[in-house]
Amino acid sequence: MDDYIKTIGLSTYEKIKKDIIFGVLPPLKKLKLKELTKTYNASISTLREILSRLAGDGFVLSQEQKGFCVSPVSKTDLYEIANLRILIESHALKKSIENSNTEWEAELLSAHYKLKVYENNMLNEKFNNKNDWKENDSEFHQTLVKNCRSENLVKLHKLIFDKYLRYQFLVLTFRGENSILEHQKLLDFTLEKNYLKAQKVLEEHIYRGLDNTVLDSDTY
């Protein structure tokens, strides 16, 4: 029974976090427990525990005597998150390349293929589901680092990546051929085990996405 409760709690945690990342729950939105029980079909005690955990992860603010609200956004926070992502993802990618094996390379090729299909379809205006596109983008970047052989590093990268992704969903513009080319170069240099070139492309990719996010936003 305890395991079942934990599973329900984890599932609800992921649903609420996803809604914050995707902008369904926008910055500074009040999170009223009674309303959330209907939306997420969870008890008040479970929701309170989940919101406290999300506060610890930086997605929610816990306000004394005022309850919970979605964390605010700012350019300062965005730049800090972007720099942290570069630091963490670069290190994890280096370790993944050092531990390179056939199974990981196959997963990487598969993740990139799915992302490339989505991006090419968007480029040719055959597809415009940006949520699915960013989920495939996330899968590719998570696969890049998963072979680092450090569970803590993978979890830390996922947390920072999700925070960065939240900002992208506030504007969510597609950079077209530039994004496609950067992902291809990142794949190629990684498979060639050329960390220095892969790291350079990764850093440029993140900073260009950052500039795009800042320029297109009037939210923060």
Identify the residue ranges that each predicted region occupies:
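C-terminal effector-binding regulatory domain of bacterial HTH transcription factors
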Residues: 1-2, 196-220
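Short linear motifs at protein or domain termini
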Residues: 1-98, 218-220
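Short helix-capping and inter-helix turn/linker motifs at the boundaries of alpha-helical repeat units
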Residues: 7, 176-177
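Short, flexible turn/loop "capping" segments at secondary-structure junctions
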Residues: 61-63, 137, 178-180
